[in-house]
Amino acid sequence: MLRLVLLLLVTDFAASHETLDSSDSQIMKRSQFRTPDCGHFDFPACPRNLNPVCGTDMNTYSNECTLCMKIREDGSHINIIKDEPC
């Protein structure tokens, strides 16, 4: 019985270690996201140009300024995944 418990613990540890490794690779990918440059926009209005960006919250914003407005309103931390719709 003790051997079975030890075997289950070792198996569980190995599985959690693999999960940790895969989440580490996700963190590396996240560090490659672009931080929006919110300092050069005149709030509360944004230009109406359509230049979509995909945020790390998986929402598409019509341009970088609208993403910055969302960050300003919510205080959330959203980076840009890509310069196109999600």
From Swiss-Prot:
Broad class of the protein's primary localization: secreted
SUPFAM superfamilies xrefs: Kazal-type serine protease inhibitors
Gene Ontology CC terms: acrosomal vesicle; cytoplasm; extracellular region; neuron projection
Tissue localization of expression: Expressed in sperm (at protein level). Expressed in testis but not in ovary, brain, heart, kidney or lung. Within testis, expressed in epididymis and germ cells.
One record GO biological process: apoptotic process
Coiled-coil regions listed in the entry: none
Location of the Kazal-like domain: 32-86
A GO term, aspect molecular function: serine-type endopeptidase inhibitor activity
InterPro entries for the chain: Kazal_dom, Kazal_dom_sf, SPINK2
SMART domains according to UniProt: KAZAL
Lineage: superkingdom: Eukaryota
Disulfide bonds: 38-68, 46-65, 54-86
Disruption phenotype: Knockout male mice are completely infertile, whereas no reproductive defects are observed in females. Spermatozoa are completely absent from caudal epididymis, which only contains round cells likely corresponding to round spermatids and multinucleated cells. Seminiferous tubules contain germ cells up to the early round-spermatid stage but condensed and elongated spermatids and mature spermatozoa are completely absent. Round spermatids do not contain an acrosomal vesicle.
Site (Reactive bond): 48-49
Cellular localisation: Secreted; Cytoplasmic vesicle, Secretory vesicle, Acrosome
Signal peptide residue numbers: 1-16
Keyword set, alphabetical order: Apoptosis, Cytoplasmic vesicle, Differentiation, Disulfide bond, Protease inhibitor, Secreted, Serine protease inhibitor, Signal, Spermatogenesis
Function of the protein: As a strong inhibitor of acrosin, it is required for normal spermiogenesis. It probably hinders premature activation of proacrosin and other proteases, thus preventing the cascade of events leading to spermiogenesis defects. May be involved in the regulation of serine protease-dependent germ cell apoptosis. It also inhibits trypsin.
Additional information: On the 2D-gel the determined pI of this protein is: 5, its MW is: 8 kDa.
Protein known as: Serine protease inhibitor Kazal-type 2
